[in-house]
Amino acid sequence: MYLVVGLGNIGKEYKQTRHNIGFDVVDIIAEKYNIEINRQKFKGSYGEGRIGNEKIILLKPSTYMNLSGESVIEAANFYKIDKENIIVIYDDMSIDIGKLRVRGKGSAGGHNGIKNIIQHLNSDIFPRVRVGIGQPDENVVNYVLGKFSKDQREIIEKVLAMSAKACISIVEDGVTEAMNKYNGVKIEV
């Protein structure tokens, strides 16, 4: 069983912002596998389904980004999911737009949502899909809560689809295979 968590902020004002990349990827997976994310529990919205023979829980925390760990730990404990089977999808400023990076473990890298998840799980050993949003020319908060330009959006739509495939690959083939397949790929217009 896998817990697939997309990080983001709830509310219409945050829809399609850079910081809501995780929510967007989870929505793509939900659509592909006909999973309704309409149940409220674990301080978030979730739905259950299958990727092949593997049961998955899709979770969108409603705690706001910086407290995402509260939601993740509640769902993980309820379903008794191993940390190695918790996949977290989120935006990453250290990666260029058009790229993603799959990792099996690692530090928060300055991302407060991941930092909070690491604190609550008491471990940094969980897979993640880091989606590049590029470096800001402006205030970081304004940047991550801002929307992509039209040109960037074209690239991001393709990266979101690729990120969903990377998550599915982790479930079906394992982290190493997903890393080999998706790390280093760059989407351009």
From Swiss-Prot:
Gene Ontology cellular component terms for the protein in this record: cytoplasm
Top-level EC class: hydrolase
UniProt catalytic activity: an N-acyl-L-alpha-aminoacyl-tRNA + H2O = an N-acyl-L-amino acid + a tRNA + H(+)
Main location: cytoplasm
InterPro entries xrefs: Pept_tRNA_hydro, Pept_tRNA_hydro_CS, Pept_tRNA_hydro_sf
Site for Stabilizes the basic form of H active site to accept a proton, residues: D91
Residue numbers annotated as active site: H19 (proton acceptor)
Superkingdom in the source lineage: Bacteria
Family: Belongs to the PTH family.
Subunit structure: Monomer.
UniProt protein name: Peptidyl-tRNA hydrolase
Name of the gene encoding the protein in the UniProt record: pth
